[in-house]
Amino acid sequence: MSMLYYTLLIAILISVQAAPKTKDHAPARSSAKSRIPHHTHRTKSLHHSHGKLEAKEPSYFRNVTVDPKLFRKRKFRSPRVLFSTQPPPLSEDFQHLEYLDDEESLNKTIRAKRTVHPVLHKGEYSVCDSVSMWVGEKTKATDIKGKEVTVLGEVNINNSVFKQYFFETKCRDPKPVSSGCRGIDAKHWNSYCTTTHTFVKALTMEGKQAAWRFIRIDTACVCVLSRKGRT
């Protein structure tokens, strides 16, 4: 009888000690569950924030959209400035190509004007040697006020990308012959070839808007003379 009593007493004590352990574990599981959504929310927030840091601002001056009316208002057009969807011919026979204006300004073609440059015949030579080419990678230039300005390389007109080209001429060599310019009396004159400039109306950025502005480009190669002193 006493053995049965002790057995029942031990069983009761074991059940009493086990009950608090069960209550202690329950809040722990509940707490773990409550922290999971919070951790997930923080993770999403971190990913969202990280995405903002990685986002890059698009280049502002790349493929700027321009109102076609801006071309119809342009004055002082120069045959040395061309807007085209394709590279212009490199031959000097087409050095007077220009962008079709007014009603034809959105046509993706170019035309040639009659040349006014003298043609050298056999036995005739230039005083200075020059090279002419279309320049389509101009990003900076000096305006008529002497300030550096940003030149628009490409513009978007009616969902078509047009590139701005400049026909530039510069000296090939400051001294085509040992004495300087070709055909100059070296006994009485010092001479050398130099590139000269002119100003043309080009599309540039003014603040946050595209605007026409006079910029300086290379346009000719001339001979500079100075009289030698008497000996």
Swiss-Prot record:
Residues 1-18 form the signal peptide. GO terms for molecular function: growth factor activity; nerve growth factor receptor binding. The keyword Nucleotide-binding does not apply. One of its GO terms (biological process) is nerve growth factor signaling pathway. Gene3D superfamilies: Cystine-knot cytokines. SMART domains: NGF. It is found in: Secreted. Residues 35-50 have a biased composition (Basic residues). It comes from the Eukaryota. Keywords: Cleavage on pair of basic residues, Disulfide bond, Glycoprotein, Growth factor, Secreted, Signal. Residues 19-114 form a propeptide. Pfam families: NGF. Coiled coil: none annotated. This is Nerve growth factor. The gene is ngf.
